[in-house]
Amino acid sequence: RHAAEAAKIMGKYQEALRQQLNDAGAFIGKQDHYITRQSHDPIRIKGDGSPAAFDAWRDFILPRLDPITFRDAPNPEQMLRNIYNNLKTGVHTTSTSDTLAGFSGPANLAKRVSQERVLIFRDADAWFDYNAQFGRGAVADSIIASLEKGARDVALMRQFGTNPQAMLDGWIDRLRTAARDRSDDATAKQLGSKFPNQVLAVLDGSAAIPGSATLAQAGATVRALQQLAKLGGVVLSSLPDLAVNAAMLRHNGIPLFHAYAREMTALIPKGPETQQVARALGVGIDTLLGDVAARLGTDEALSGRISRATNLFYKLNGLAYWTDAMKRTSGLMLASNLADSAARAFPDLPPRLQATLRRYSIEGAEWDAIRAAPQRTADGTAYLLPEAVADADTARKLAAYYADQVREGMTETTAGVRAMASLGTQAGTPAGELVRLLMQFKTFTITYMTRSLGREFRRDGIDAGGLAHLIAATTALGYLSMTLKDLAKGRNPREPDDAASYGKLVAAAMVQGGGLGIYGDFLFGEANRVGGGFIGTLAGPTAGSIEGVQKLLSAARGEGNAAAEAIRLGVGHTPFVNLFYARFGLDYAVIYRLQEWANPGYLRRMEQRVKRDNNQTFWLRPTEAVR
């Protein structure tokens, strides 16, 4: 019974998505009992790359397809071969490819999405059989991926028309011509940059088409394993989110003290009515979507097991709950703020709120439509929801406002940042995978610099008050994060005793609060928290891992302590071991004992080094714990 109810709900929203795609320019026919598109794993489909791989795929899928699949195909064999060639390269995952069933011509998004339901399976058992053999993830994963991709296609067609690349090229050509006509050579040269096309490639998914599906999957797996081994304490580094969120809310006309007061209650579960409002706003559901890692800049197509392990990891380390709670609170505050402001005309709104709304093309007429909408009350608080706005276009603008402002407050990456971080390279190529390994964990910092700090510098001139608040608040919360991480390591808070050590402490807190937490320890002369050096950290965690392997090999040749290096490497690369609460117990119960066994006197020297470099002691000394 529950499965049937779930299928009806999914069918309802798939049908709504189909209608939105058609309204945007596609021509997708209605298919009875349609629930979701089939997922396809390029690596499984490609097999060994031989002609026999196509034969195996064709022989498996053909008896499971409904004959209606080939109703307009004069040559079913050729149709399947065309589909196979697209599936094995991953082209089917993008919004620009135009040939799923053998069509040709310029890339046309409307035509592309209209071909998405080419493979029609005979029944549910046939769908599941194919998914188990050549698909990726469970049916729920496929449903969410289908809705996400459909929403992306709708957004692209609404903004860029049915041929996004041609539309973008046309805009750029017209702007360059205008710049040349007014002899503005600098602007004309800037418009010749490849960056706009690189951003579009991220938006439409073509940047993720792997040059080699095997290489792309290997790189994605390595990066996922680095997350599982390195980010166990990331929630302790997330306290500066409070300041970044408050700064965003300030630019929406919400006083700072009110923002902080509401944020302090963010982790307290909300009532069912308020949770329904948050869901209607589309905020605080990252855990449900398996998308918590997105705020760290990850954008990987992971295999089912690795994906499930990653989602579990972020639940266990607390980041999933923290992210959902913070986004839910921010979204509710924005919606409540607009409801409270509904009695005012647009010119009477706070100037910062006006400026922010204008970024989403919300001005006098749109604001009048929004404030005329019926408000929804939950647990005694009124909210303005997009679904209540009568004009569909204005409702979409309001929804975009809520979603983007919440993402800005949580320092989530944008398409521009992802394009910048990938340097325009393609996934699954040697250069592309190298860049992605080097840039792992750095997109968060780039986003903070460009979105949060950039907002205070560039929007309507320098906002001195906003800049001062952001720096001071993130520094204070950065220090609190450092202190919590020290306590989790068994150490007392750092105690500077002169001007130089105070300066180092403030600088490290600024770095921690500004999104560079993994580099903060180096200002205290320490290696990073997993034992790698500064160069290894700058070059990405995988470079640090290679550095660790090199040290182990050198030690095995008699140039060091092989047992100690093996312990350090193993601890730093075992998934889930670095969960901050588990790591504390493991350190004192097992790891410190192993390190002392492998390198007698190691713990005493570590305590002395921490005292010498940081003037810091332990509230639970490792040397006492191993006696």
Residue ranges, per PLM feature:
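Hydrophobic, often aromatic-rich secondary-structure segments at membrane interfaces
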Residues: 112-236, 240-507
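Hydrophobic or amphipathic alpha-helical targeting/insertion segments
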Residues: 13-20, 24
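Short linear, low-complexity motifs centered on an aromatic residue
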Residues: 24-40, 251-265, 455-462, 557, ...
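Hydrophobic alpha-helical segments
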Residues: 557-627
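Long, charge-dense tracts
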Residues: 50-146, 150
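Low-complexity, small/polar and acidic-rich linker and loop segments
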Residues: 1-15, 36, 43-44
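Small-residue (glycine/alanine-rich) low-complexity segments and short Gly/Pro motifs
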Residues: 456-568
